[in-house]
Amino acid sequence: MTAPSQVLKIRRPDDWHVHLRDGDMLKTVVPYTSEIYGRAIVMPNLASPITTVDAAIAYRQRILNAVPAGHDFTPLMTCYLTDSLDADELERGFHEGVFTAAKLYPANATTNSSHGVTSVDAIMPVLERMEKLGMPLLVHGEVTHADVDIFDREARFIDTVMEPLRQRLTTLKVVFEHITTKDAAQYVRDGNDYLAATITPQHLMFNRNDMLVGGIRPHLYCLPILKRNIHQQALRELVASGFTRAFLGTDSAPHSRHRKETSCGCAGCFNAPSALGSYAAVFEEMNALAHFEAFCSLNGPQFYGLPVNAGWVELVRDEQQIPGNIALADDSLVPFLAGETIRWSVKK
């Protein structure tokens, strides 16, 4: 029997879905991402969403100002799609290298999404322009109708929004973000080269029982919400198969402790401190470490048409305890897996 590996050396990874927030929160969380990842797709859902080139440039600079000396990190900015977005502004941002992609939030699907798209038809001219440009569309794939059960919103989105959209715009590059269901896993697997998916560590590690049995665990509450075990297993099998159109997207989404531990808590897991080690643990459990580097470091650049990162990262089998909280101005952040021990950690 071969002894388990003690070191994993991979090409420096990228995070293809992260929330860095703004202000004091941004200054606190950016270093956890910039230390490990060469690039990150930064979500545009600030309180005032990023809908113009100038706003994206200013936000990018605030991010870069928060990157510690010695970290080689490039934030990749995204445009928040709204019903009234100017297609010319989007094209200008793409050509000038400011916007890497555009994000479709169905209105009121998640944090700061009230400005989101009310219907795909409302933004069809923008999407047609994106198809011509080869600009990726990043999709939060849930319907938000009040009569649809929260656990069914992703599957319903595939049938009523995603598939009709892709039938209409056959060469539009689409990233189905943070997929959570066997329906989405199969849909992406069956798709063509214009369709890819990101998957979070929490959706690979946990299911809704982990969040709800024996007490509510608010720090596992995110959107899309954790699903049944059968869906978790489908996601694990997808990544373990070496499927090349699935890649790392943490959806790290920090909220202060008092906004999570409350009678109406916010959705999001702040997983940046432990995500890479968490992914490694899942791949090891699935006997799929041979596919770990591709998921973290190769598949995303291939889909986006970008070069892989030049540097390397080493993970070591060295148990580390995740801190119970992280200081944040006059509050604190509770990270994903707070107080728990993970068996893979990034070598400093």
UniProtKB/Swiss-Prot annotation:
It comes from Salmonella heidelberg (strain SL476). Binds 2 Zn(2+) ions per subunit. Belongs to the metallo-dependent hydrolases superfamily. DHOase family. Class II DHOase subfamily. InterPro entries: Amidohydro-rel (IPR006680), DHOdimr (IPR004721), Dihydroorotase_CS (IPR002195), Metal_Hydrolase (IPR032466). Substrate binds at H19, L20, R21, N45, H140, L223, H255, A267. This is Dihydroorotase. It comes from the Bacteria. The active site is at D251. Its EC number is 3.5.2.3. Pathway: Pyrimidine metabolism; UMP biosynthesis via de novo pathway; (S)-dihydroorotate from bicarbonate: step 3/3. GO terms for molecular function: dihydroorotase activity; zinc ion binding. Zn(2+) 2 binds at K103, H140, H178. SUPFAM superfamilies: Metallo-dependent hydrolases. PANTHER family: DIHYDROOROTASE (PTHR43137:SF1). It catalyses: (S)-dihydroorotate + H2O = N-carbamoyl-L-aspartate + H(+). One of its GO terms (biological process) is 'de novo' UMP biosynthetic process. It is an enzyme of class 3 (hydrolase). Catalyzes the reversible cyclization of carbamoyl aspartate to dihydroorotate. The modification N6-carboxylysine is found at K103. One of its GO terms (cellular component) is cytosol. Homodimer.
